[in-house]
């Protein structure tokens, strides 16, 4: 069965002065494990969250960052790309646009990464925004990777 695990959760809170500030990190990082053995990470969070990501892999068990086949970046901002070095065996995908990045495969059209897993260009706050759509027992999508509004990550669950 395809599964989705949250590695680190991006969360925003309202500061005393009314500004929006991260609580921990700005962006969420997730692990998708498919029926056919693909391991996909969506965003790698900010660099200082590396220990949290490694800890999540230990809690999940039987999988390590080196086992990840593909990393998809919902866009190229620093809070989404900070731990790419953890996934040294993975192909890294991002949609074209934004700043160029070494070692990243740029896409112009959607890509099926594994059966039932598609990376699709979607509107966002950057020209290179994309979302991962996953067909599972429940439909998960889109995974924009942003903390979104106050209150936590945006993950829309829709039943089939």
Regions found by a protein language model. Give the residues of each.
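Metallo-beta-lactamase
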Residues: 48, 127-160
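Active-site HxH/HxHxD metal-binding segment of metal-dependent hydrolases
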Residues: 20, 25-26, 44-115, 150
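Active-site metal-binding loops of divalent metal-dependent hydrolases
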Residues: 9-12, 43-47, 76, 124-126, ...
């Amino acid at each position: 069965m395809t599964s989705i695990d949250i590695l680190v959760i991006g969360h925003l809170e309202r500061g005393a002065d009314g500004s929006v500030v991260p609580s921990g990190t700005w962006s969420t990082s997730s692990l998708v494990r498919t029926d056919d053995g693909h391991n996909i990470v969506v965003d790698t969070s900010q660099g200082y969250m590396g220990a949290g990501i490694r800890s999540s892999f230990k809690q999940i068990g039987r999988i390590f960052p080196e086992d990840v086949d593909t990393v998809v970046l919902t866009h190229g901002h620093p809070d989404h790309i900070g731990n790419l070095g953890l996934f040294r065996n993975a192909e890294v995908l991002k949609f074209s646009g934004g700043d160029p990045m070494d070692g990243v495969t740029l896409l112009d059209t959607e890509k099926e990464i594994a059966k039932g897993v598609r990376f699709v260009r979607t509107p966002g706050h950057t020209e290179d925004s994309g979302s991962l759509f996953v067909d599972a027992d429940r439909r998960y999508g889109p995974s924009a990777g942003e903390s979104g509004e106050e209150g936590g990550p945006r993950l829309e669950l829709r039943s089939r």
